[in-house]
Amino acid sequence: MLEHFRAGWAKVMNPIANALLRAHVTPDVVTWIGTIGAVLMALICFPQGWLWQGPWLVTLFIFSDSLDGNMARKLGRHSQWGSFLDSTLDRFGDAAIFVGVALYFAGPGHSMLWTAMACAALVFGMATSYVRAKAESLGLEAKMGIATRAERLLV
């Protein structure tokens, strides 16, 4: 569903990517900053119960996920290493979101059911990524599924 917006989103992100490249910021730096920011925001905001502010702050850092690849392509440096780094750090960002939500629901006054659901979302999110990576490492195409990463995080 959200994949339909990719072309339009690229037009929005191009000027930002160009500005960062002019400032000599590398795609890997953008990847790291985005991940560290998303992890910190998720682990600070969600356990504190900032369930409206937290997603906005986390989303600001997750936007870097579309910037780093854009920047690498503009530099002609789109590489397997960059792809590996990006997808690996994405898992840390995703995990922090679910851990932050689980910590919130583990607090007083909440049902453990919600904590369990956040933990299940973490497990299934990691499993989805692992299954795709493993299939691709075996030469299989693994493009199927009901939701992309962006859609899984949105839900």
Residue ranges and their predicted role:
Residues 44-48, 67-71, 100-107:
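Membrane-helix exit/interface motif
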Residues 33-40, 56-60, 64, 99, ...:
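Lipid-exposed faces of alpha-helical membrane segments in multi-pass integral membrane proteins
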Residues 23-26, 46, 50, 75-78, ...:
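Membrane-interfacial loop-to-transmembrane-helix junctions in polytopic alpha-helical membrane proteins
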Residues 1-17, 88-155:
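A feature for the membrane-embedded catalytic helix bundles of lipid/isoprenoid biosynthetic enzymes
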Residues 53-99, 127, 131-136:
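Acidic (Asp/Glu-rich) catalytic motifs at the cytosolic membrane interface
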Residues 1-56:
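Topogenic membrane-insertion module of multi-pass membrane proteins
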Residues 30, 50, 65, 78, ...:
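Short glycine- and Lys/Arg-enriched binding-loop motifs that mark or flank ligand-binding interfaces
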